[in-house]
Amino acid sequence: YLDSGAVTVSAAGAHYYGLNGEHLAEEVLSVENPVLSASRTTAVAYDAGNQSLFVFRGGAESFRLSLTGSNNLLSARVNNSGWLAVTAQQSGFKGAVTVYNSHGREVITIGLSSVFAVDAAVSPDGQSVAVVTMGQEQGDFFSRLLLYPLDQTEPSRQVDLGALTVLDLAYE
């Protein structure tokens, strides 16, 4: 639930309903791997491994993103202020994270060439983004959590997670 209604996503697309049951917005399309991520105010519905993403807030669809070429969505997370972190396979990188503000404008893109980006989340204050990465050194897999200020493409902090596989991420 959002403060203004409920969003569902399925193989038939994404639907936004008001708290009174009124149909507020929808995106009807075939979705292979439907995923929904939500905060108190905003929901993002997307097709993991594909190219379509939709953001719902305040009773309407507020933003949409369609990747092109061989770029595909891996994850998308939204904070309570409506800022969005999109992790994607992007040509020329092992992974990339793009942060969008609450108006759908791109703030920063972080391209990673030596490790894979698997997930990301924007801080509650919209000042930084946490990025989960995976890589391999001398045959051993490793994970790291990288913290980036939104005005820098180099991390300000790095947390080595060893061989742990991160299954979920929240920036509180």
Short names for language-model regions:
Residues 20-28, 60-67, 105-111, 154-160:
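A short beta-strand motif characteristic of beta-propeller blades
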Residues 1-10, 14-16, 35-48, 52-55, ...:
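Short beta-strand elements that form the blades of beta-propeller/WD-repeat-like
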